[in-house]
From Swiss-Prot:
It comes from Synechococcus sp. (strain CC9902). The gene is ndk. The keyword Translocase does not apply. PROSITE patterns: NDPK, NDPK_LIKE. This is Nucleoside diphosphate kinase. GO terms for molecular function: ATP binding; metal ion binding; nucleoside diphosphate kinase activity. PANTHER family: NUCLEOSIDE DIPHOSPHATE KINASE (PTHR11349).
Length: 151
């Protein structure tokens, strides 16, 4: 199985109508969407997702923000998808993100940076398991697979 990563369009990205733009960037890169849903996260889900930041001063604000509205949760699959997604997304701080990245082009500030992406294989596995049931992920092969990826 190819590598998988978790990506979430945060409430600011959903409210600003950026879902199609962001999905398109991942599709044009050649990654395969295997899981997709819109959900307003519960406080418990948000606290577990951001648990590594629990002792940080911004934790409460982060949890409050991510639970403030709908999030588009996605699982993308492809060779090197974790590292590639991080490059597509850009730096956490939008002012440090390169033009052409999602945050460089679309994000306003660190508190409203539009998108989240897993940063490592272990994180991706944890986040996918947290946000998706196995039955919500679809194994499928695009008809143009041979034109995108070398065997």
């Amino acid at each position: 199985m190819a590598e998988r990563t978790f990506v979430a369009i945060k409430p600011d990205g959903v409210q600003r109508g950026l879902v199609g733009e962001i999905l398109g960037r991942f599709e044009r890169k050649g990654f395969k969407l295997v899981g997709l849903k819109q959900i307003t996260p519960s406080r418990a889900l948000a606290e577990e997702h951001y648990g590594v930041h629990k002792e940080r001063p911004f934790f409460a604000g982060l949890v409050g923000f991510i639970t403030s509205g709908p999030v588009v949760a996605m699982v993308w699959e492809g060779d090197g998808v974790i590292a590639s997604a991080r490059k597509l997304i850009g730096a956490t701080k939008p002012l440090e993100s390169e033009p052409g990245t999602i945050r460089g082009d679309l994000a306003v500030n660190i508190g409203r940076n539009v998108i989240h992406g897993s940063d490592a294989p272990e994180t991706a596995e944890f986040e996918i398991g947290l946000w998706f049931q196995p039955s919500e992920l679809n194994d499928w092969s695009p008809s143009d697979q041979a034109w995108r990826v070398e065997d």
